[in-house]
Amino acid sequence: MGIMEAERKTTGWAARDPSGILSPYTYTLRETGPEDVNIRIICCGICHTDLHQTKNDLGMSNYPMVPGHEVVGEVVEVGSDVSKFTVGDIVGVGCLVGCCGGCSPCERDLEQYCPKKIWSYNDVYINGQPTQGGFAKATVVHQKFVVKIPEGMAVEQAAPLLCAGVTVYSPLSHFGLKQPGLRGGILGLGGVGHMGVKIAKAMGHHVTVISSSNKKREEALQDLGADDYVIGSDQAKMSELADSLDYVIDTVPVHHALEPYLSLLKLDGKLILMGVINNPLQFLTPLLMLGRKVITGSFIGSMKETEEMLEFCKEKGLSSIIEVVKMDYVNTAFERLEKNDVRYRFVVDVEGSNLDA
């Protein structure tokens, strides 16, 4: 069932140009269709991708752009054919709001690999209307791309799980790396990396954090529970780790050499790339051939994996380490994020902010 035209206007904070500066922006929500869920947004995490998109770092940004793809809110209306949700449910929306439904990935419930997937923002619906993200009062999303937040999970803690959490959970699940006793490495300790440590530890893995400096050692070992911490340039320590890891999750989003991390892998070990890097990466093929090692990639996660991940995090008592901010601080938060000055994820308190300011 639809909603009144007067109620279809909402306000978000949008970037207007590649400066990336956000300010209030009023726009029209799409009508609530038969399978749509209308959501009053409570909070939204800030991902590094939001920074790239608002500044047009990837060369494909469209403005005005309301970012945000780690959205948690309350259902205020459901379409006539919605069966999964009722008014009052606390729900989440991640990176996607649409897919074709008929391709091979969609048929396998891997909609994140659909060639016609629709992003939560900086994209268009099939009718040509722009998609807008979670830095706003409300959003309307097809029920397929909405998940229930487990009862008892704090909304601000749930938000980063919808991107950072599922991004590391998905490859561990898909590549058969969930069983206890494995030895893994997490390269890079940002928003995704810190959840990688937590999730891998909760699966019973021995986890080594690999970083470029010592500044996060204490946090990694004491706050996140990592078993070891290695500086990538420490040749002696890296040599000690050679041929010892079942996998390395590489979250680094800038160009870097792969050989040092390939050398850490056991026979059949996997180097799983997650950082978006536009420059070609190089490696020596014998490093792969002589250990039957694998370089692979993984991209966010499916809706089924997102649901599994949320239940896993609830069961294990996992949460993100976050800093909650108001919307009027968001531009400063973006500046700090660009300098990696956050431990480990900003979450915008949308409900408690004046978006019209």
From Swiss-Prot:
Its cofactor is Zn(2+). SMART domains: PKS_ER. The lineage of its organism: Eukaryota, Viridiplantae, Streptophyta, Embryophyta, Tracheophyta. Expressed at the lateral root initiation sites, in the vascular tissues of the primary lateral root and the root caps. Expressed in the hypocotyl, cotyledon and leaf veins, apical meristem region, at the base of the trichomes, hydathodes and cauline leaves. In stems, expressed in the cells associated with the vascular cambium, interfascicular cambium and the developing xylem. Expressed in the vascular strand of petals and sepals, anthers, stamen filaments, stigma in flowers, and abscission, style and stigmatic regions of siliques. This is Cinnamyl alcohol dehydrogenase 5. GO terms for biological process: lignin biosynthetic process. Pathway: Aromatic compound metabolism; phenylpropanoid biosynthesis. The keyword Ubl conjugation does not apply. GO terms for molecular function: cinnamyl-alcohol dehydrogenase activity; coniferyl-alcohol dehydrogenase activity; zinc ion binding. Zn(2+) 2 binds at residues 100, 103, 106, 114. Keywords: Lignin biosynthesis, Metal-binding, NADP, Oxidoreductase, Zinc. PANTHER family: ALDEHYDE REDUCTASE.
